[in-house]
Regions:
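Functionally critical transmembrane alpha-helices in membrane proteins and complexes, commonly lining
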Residues: 3-59, 78-84, 111-115, 128-130, ...
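Interfacial loop-to-helix transition and helix-capping segments at the boundaries
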Residues: 5, 30-42, 101, 118-130, ...
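Aromatic-anchored segments of alpha-helical transmembrane domains
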Residues: 16-24, 92-93, 111-115, 156-167, ...
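Alpha-helical transmembrane segments of multi-pass integral membrane proteins
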Residues: 39, 187, 191-192, 208-312
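Transmembrane alpha-helical segments and their boundary/interface "anchor" motifs
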Residues: 39-42, 46-48, 58-92, 106, ...
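Membrane-interface helix-loop-helix regions
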Residues: 67, 74, 81-132, 159-178, ...
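Membrane-proximal cytoplasmic C-terminal regulatory module of class A 7TM GPCRs
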Residues: 69, 262, 290, 311-337
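Solvent-exposed interhelical
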Residues: 132-159, 167-168, 194-210
Length: 337
């Protein structure tokens, strides 16, 4: 799959929102719900992930009338595991006093979203765990029920807010509150976008801008009462998903120069490694250093990207060429959020 213009730019914006969300808790710049933009950035990553993975799987199904789960999981393993396991190894050594083997196991097996006692350095791994669980479920479901994919995705998109609101109503704050079903609508709308992208009309610039503005403003909604919180969970969050999907579709249809500017695209390319390493520096424990923490975060991300991610992607392509000498090689553009 060729690199899609503007998506690296969206990744750059997303990782910037995550870091602003963390650093927004710094006492000298605490303005409004800046920390909510961390969640918004992750939400964009989920939509992008659903879109890209589904697009990749549908292209394979169109070519061969099937989906090779083995090949899919091998590609994901080369893309995701090396950088993540290097990060885990480093922080396990640095913070061994705060670690228990169960925390390491939860991170390695991508169930950190269910680990309520994990140390602060693993707090961000909840979203990567949800994505990995999505990778385990969705390709299998798409292969088995390909003809019913649209019905399945619509049911998930509409059912998730109901499930989320019910959890809030019964005050369930245990491990299930961070589980895949709670966030499935964000992934589902990205999948739906991949299914219908070619058939959807071009989104006018004013509508694309309006959805982008709405996505930025919705986190400011004051969920200050139970009724307001239910309204946010049941209505506003699905609306935010629609706005994000609309923005993704718009920038694919009309590539923006700013999103494809080399420094912005580069930040998007290293966004996975940057997401892994920013937690080490941009946590509550280090907030008194402020925005200077961005520098070591990017430095570690660069080391991870150039010395771990890219070599493993080149190895993946080399092995793919040996396995299928005459077939197309998947590029790193199919990378997850």
């Amino acid at each position: 799959m060729k690199r899609i213009p503007s998506l690296d730019g969206l990744r750059a914006i997303s990782i910037a929102m995550v870091m602003v969300g963390h650093l927004g808790k710094w006492k000298h710049i605490s303005v409004g719900p800046l920390d909510s933009y961390g969640s918004l950035g992750v939400q964009v990553f989920f939509v992008l992930s659903g879109f890209l993975i589904t697009k990749l799987l549908l292209q394979e199904h169109d070519r061969s009338s099937t989906i090779s789960l083995g090949n899919f999981y091998a590609r994901r393993a080369f893309r995701i595991f090396p950088a993540a396991f290097v990060f885990l190894a480093v922080v396990a050594v640095l913070f061994w006093r705060e670690m228990h083997w169960t925390h390491i196991a939860a991170a390695v097996f991508y169930v950190a979203n269910m680990d309520e006692t994990k140390p602060w350095i693993f707090n961000h791994l909840w979203s990567l765990s949800i994505e990995e669980q999505f990778y385990l479920v969705w390709p299998f479901a798409l292969k088995k029920w390909h003809r019913h994919k649209t019905k399945i995705l619509i049911a998930v998109f509409l059912g998730t807010p109901v499930f989320r609101a019910l959890l809030y109503a019964v005050k369930s704050h245990g491990p299930i509150g961070g589980s895949l079903p709670v966030y499935s609508d964000q992934l589902a709308i990205g999948c739906l976008l991949a299914v219908f992208a070619k058939r959807l009309p071009r989104i006018p610039g004013y509508l694309g801008a309006g959805m982008a503005i709405a996505a930025v403003l919705l986190p400011w909604y004051p969920a200050t009462s139970p009724v307001r919180s239910l309204f946010m969970l049941f209505v506003l969050r699905p609306l935010l998903n629609v706005c994000i999907a609309g923005v993704v579709l718009h920038v694919i249809q009309v590539p923006y120069r700013a999103l494809n500017w080399a420094p912005v695209a580069w930040l998007g390319q290293i966004s996975y490694s940057l997401y892994l390493w920013q937690e080490l520096f941009c946590s509550n424990a280090n907030l008194h250093y402020g925005f200077v923490l961005i520098v070591p975060s990017i430095a570690c991300a660069c080391l991870s990207y150039y010395f771990v991610e890219r070599p493993m992607l080149r190895l993946r392509e080399k092995l793919a060429r040996k396995a299928q000498p005459s077939g197309p090689v998947l590029k790193a553009a199919s990378q997850p959020a």
